[in-house]
Amino acid sequence: MPEIIGSNLEKCILMMVKGSALRHLLKAKSSDSMSNRAQAMKMSSHRKYCSISLALKKFLSRSKLFGISVGTEHISLDKATDRILARNIQCPIDIPPFQRSTVDGYAIRSSAAKGAARNDQVVLNVIDKINAGKDSRAKIRSGEAIAIATGAKIPAGADSVIMIEDVIIEDMRKKIRISHRIDRGSNITPRGGDLRKGQILLKKGTWLTAADIGLIASVGKSRLLVYKKVKVAVLSTGSELAEPGSKLDDASIFDSNRFMLSSMVRKQGGEPIDLGICKDEKSVIRAKINQALKFDVILISGGSSVGEKDYVPGLINEIGKPGIIVSGVAMKPGSPTSLGIANGKPVIVLPGYPVSAFVAFYTFGRPLLYNILKSSGPPVARQVAKLTSNVKLHRGMTTFVRVRILRRHGCFFAKPVSAAGASLLSTLAYSDGIVVAKYNNRGLKREYMLHKGQNVEVVLLREVYQEA
């Protein structure tokens, strides 16, 4: 059902309902759909919206009471991207495990170059060469040097490395001339200079990125203990929905929410379980919800509002206590979102409009999965940008504004795509990010607007490089 925005228009309609004029008008209308729509508007006007912060607090605290646990498993390092560590990882060795050169050059004793100057150069004999991965049995004495590659082990007797660019090479690379002094330890990474044995590399709950996996590989570990993926049942409701790839009739639309939500679940550490499309029939929806209770979390798209065919919240209440704990959230889009617990399983009832469903999962689905996985989640890319136009906010609501990011002369600008149109998935697909604008109702002066030129923080949905 479409979201109904509270406004003066609604108040007028409700006043008319009480008066005879609209009663006679409604009697004159034979269409059941008109009657249903008026009833839905009346019910919506009495709906109290919960703030996002309070709704999330209620939902997560109730979810914790049921102690959802997904267990752990060992996996190979090559499968660890975007998985969550189930225990701390300690460094088993010093990294590097030996002193190594940070440059291509010559390993020497720093004392040998103590008196070197442009007009009083020091000559050293080159006695060996060490490539990365090799060692030298030679021990450097005064007046000697060993050619060394970046990353190679420092030979015995040497305490510094002089860069190849800072020497004069003579006699078929058998001698070098040095014209300046060099400090002890120059161009050398000491043993354990990066990581020390016993050091905590990564903590339990870390969301593993490419850099983390490289770090783990650098200390020789090939298998990890991680949390199992949260199994999330994903169900779309609506008699108008058709499966992508099927033939579309005149009164149907393709189901996009199920695929969008499944993709979001995967990205946020879950394993989506596709329960398909469910027609707007109470008994069928009940059976699907009972099937979904086998899994850890339930996402239901559609049927969250107050229309005649919006059965889902009532069924959640019937199936298991405490049932729906939040009905309606003060956010646009996504205000008809409901949150509940059925037989110990968290349930998010998302609006049928695609943008609303996206925002609702972003707001409640992500934190729920992170909570179950005992993680703060993956890094979130953000960009500060200047608005290119004014944006009107919904009173008493947190507004999620879709924007394009433009880059001009090194500066970033946020161009609003749409503050409305929750049914228009293209406005989300063509956006680079979202501005989360909290309504400020403190004090006598109330701001209903984000202003052109104002700096805003954009939560990026994709990487942005282009220069506009």
Q: Which functions belong to the PLM regions below?
A:
Residues 47-54, 72-75, 79, 103, ...:
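Conserved active-site and cofactor/substrate-binding residues in soluble primary-metabolism enzymes
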Residues 93-94, 130-135, 185-190, 435-445:
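Short alpha-helix capping/helix-loop boundary micro-motifs
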Residues 68, 73-77, 98-124, 157-173, ...:
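Short beta-strand/loop turn elements enriched in aromatics
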Residues 5, 252, 258, 267-382:
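Short glycine/threonine-rich loop/turn motifs
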Residues 2-120, 147, 190, 375-400:
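Short, low-complexity N-terminal leaders and the immediately following helix N-cap/first helix
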Residues 36-53, 106-274, 279, 418, ...:
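Short, glycine/charged-enriched hinge/interface segments at domain edges or termini
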Residues 34-37, 41-42, 100, 117, ...:
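C-terminal terminal segments
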